[in-house]
Swiss-Prot record:
NCBIfam families linked to this entry: murC
Pathway annotation from the record: Cell wall biogenesis; peptidoglycan biosynthesis
Binding residue positions for ATP: 125-131
Known role: Cell wall formation.
Annotated localization: Cytoplasm
Name used for this protein in its record: UDP-N-acetylmuramate--L-alanine ligase
Any one Pfam family match given in the protein's UniProt record, by short name: Mur_ligase
Family: Belongs to the MurCDEF family.
Catalytic activity entry: UDP-N-acetyl-alpha-D-muramate + L-alanine + ATP = UDP-N-acetyl-alpha-D-muramoyl-L-alanine + ADP + phosphate + H(+)
EC number in record: 6.3.2.8
Annotated source species: Stutzerimonas stutzeri (strain A1501)
Presence of the UniProt keyword Cytoplasm in the record: yes
Length: 485
């Protein structure tokens, strides 16, 4: 029988001497979820950010004190500061806290504290963390386990990226971008894949990145469980170094949890799961692409190990309503002779872009793909330049927005004009450069044909363009949003 929230609060040990917790950069996707859980546990929460957002408004409605702008006075009365890796010691709030000997802890350390007295499930990997974590939350809820979760994206069904549950389970993303996942000590850890990204954290040394993942897995107790995607060659390579119980998953014949008979029909993907000692299980997910089959397999592996029955697994996967900005279908835009399907996606690494393109080709093979892409960070564009040129050239029509800098200075030869030139040189596609987001609607409308899929993709401010297109007078304003079949 599930416990009441009050009972959970009584069971979970409180942090001694901590009454008010202050978040610097509270609106960030990795910060607001932890803040919400702490609010629900009864702590006083305050935080600052450079601007208001849906996240800060939500936290404020729950009782958090929100400051717009970073000022030393915001810290008054705080017992601890929580900071993301984007915040440095020059920040006036951090500087005052250090001067007054108020503890300043990384976001991941606070997440680790929440996980300390729970059965923690941490999802790591370069790609697929948010979707896998969200699927786990859905399946555990369907199994009656009511988990606490902290996710890097908004669950469509829950309308939030975090929730305090009544069970002992805490499901969270484990962030390798700044190596902060080493703070976590979960009972179960997933590694979806290991790819070259955020390499500045690792001094440009891919070997160091691999070793850090091994170190993360060794944070598991000797009786814990590492759930590993054996289809990923780098994950397969590190398995012999992991001195912990393991379960593998993938399409490979030697995977412990394996998918066969995959079939995609538009947004829904069907497949059969093979597990040692279990009957074959037919499941479906309302998400396109083999990459989402892999995310579901990781979920199934953990749910099976935790004793969730097959009926709940099937239900939790089938009813999963998706995550914000992960192949999120906004509706249809009217064009001459019909309409186009408008999709928004967060993918910002060549491997993620390739997976989404493959999903589109698999679910809608007869449709053209019109892609609007915004590279994220000049350093990533430079480091993966040739891969971007290759994969972006696979669309039918391509519009490239300028690189979203994410605080970086421009790097010569790593901007979108240069990308356009390099893709054009291949002779298969003539990309269009989009200097500003407001220019997109008039540029893209003449290019669209009835039946096209219009995909806006990237991790920067392109995330606001899909809803803007729906409201654009060029596409009929708000009347353009019609439910997609």
């Amino acid at each position: 029988m599930a416990k009441s929230p009050a009972a959970v609060k009584a069971e979970v040990r409180r942090m001694r001497r901590i009454r008010r917790i202050h978040f610097v950069g509270i609106g960030g996707v990795g910060m607001c979820g932890i803040a919400e859980v702490l609010l629900n546990l009864g702590y006083e929460v305050s935080g600052s950010d450079l601007k208001e957002s849906a996240s800060t408004e939500r936290l404020q409605s729950f009782g958090a004190q929100i400051f717009i702008g970073h000022q030393a006075g915001n810290v008054a009365g705080a017992d601890v500061l929580v900071v993301s890796s984007a915040i440095n010691s020059a920040n006036p709030e951090v500087a005052l806290a250090l001067e007054q000997r108020i503890p300043v802890v990384p976001r991941a350390e606070m997440l680790a504290e929440l996980m300390r007295y729970r059965h923690g499930i941490a999802v790591a990997g370069t790609h697929g963390k948010t979707t896998t974590t969200s699927l786990l939350a859905s399946v555990f809820a369907a199994g009656g386990l009511d988990p606490t979760f902290v996710i890097g994206g908004r669950l469509t069904a829950a309308g939030t990226n975090a929730q305090l549950g009544s069970s002992r389970y805490l499901i969270a993303e484990a962030d390798e971008s700044d190596a902060s996942f080493l703070h976590l000590q979960p009972m179960v850890a997933v590694v979806t894949n290991i790819d070259a990204d955020h390499m500045s954290t690792y001094g440009g040394d891919f070997g160091k990145l691999k070793k850090t993942f091994v170190e993360f897995l060794h944070n598991l107790p000797f009786y814990g469980l590492a759930v590993l995607c054996v289809d990923d060659p780098v994950v397969r390579e590190i398995i012999p170094q992991i001195g912990r119980p393991t379960t593998t998953y993938g399409f490979s014949e030697d995977a412990d949890v394996r998918a066969i008979n995959v079939r995609q029909e538009g947004m829904r993907t069907y497949f059969t799961v093979l597990r040692d000692g279990c009957e074959p299980l037919d499941v479906s997910v309302h998400m396109p692409g083999n990459h989402n089959v892999l995310n579901a397999l990781a979920t199934i592996a953990i749910a099976t190990d935790e004793g969730i029955d097959d009926e709940a697994i099937v239900q939790g996967l089938a009813e999963f309503a998706g995550v914000g900005r992960r192949f999120q279908v906004y509706g249809n835009l009217p064009v001459d002779g019909g309409s186009v399907m408008l999709v928004d996606d967060y993918g910002h690494h060549p491997r993620e872009v390739a997976a989404v393109i493959k999903a589109v080709r698999g679910g809608w093979p007869e449709r053209r793909l019109v892609m609007v892409y915004q590279p994220h960070r000049y350093s990533r564009t430079r480091d993966l330049y040739d891969d971007f040129v290759q994969v972006l050239g696979e669309s039918n029509v391509l519009l490239l927005m300028e690189v979203y800098p994410a605080g970086e200075e421009p790097i010569p030869g790593a901007d979108s004009r240069q990308l356009c030139h390099s893709i054009r040189q291949r002779g298969q596609l003539d990309p269009i450069y989009v200097e500003r987001g407001v220019d997109l609607a008039p540029l893209v409308k003449p290019l669209l044909r009835a039946g096209d899929i219009l995909l806006c993709q990237g991790a920067g401010d392109i995330g606001g363009l899909a809803p803007q297109l729906l409201k654009s007078p060029l596409f009929g304003g708000d009347d353009a949003a019609r439910k997609t079949k």
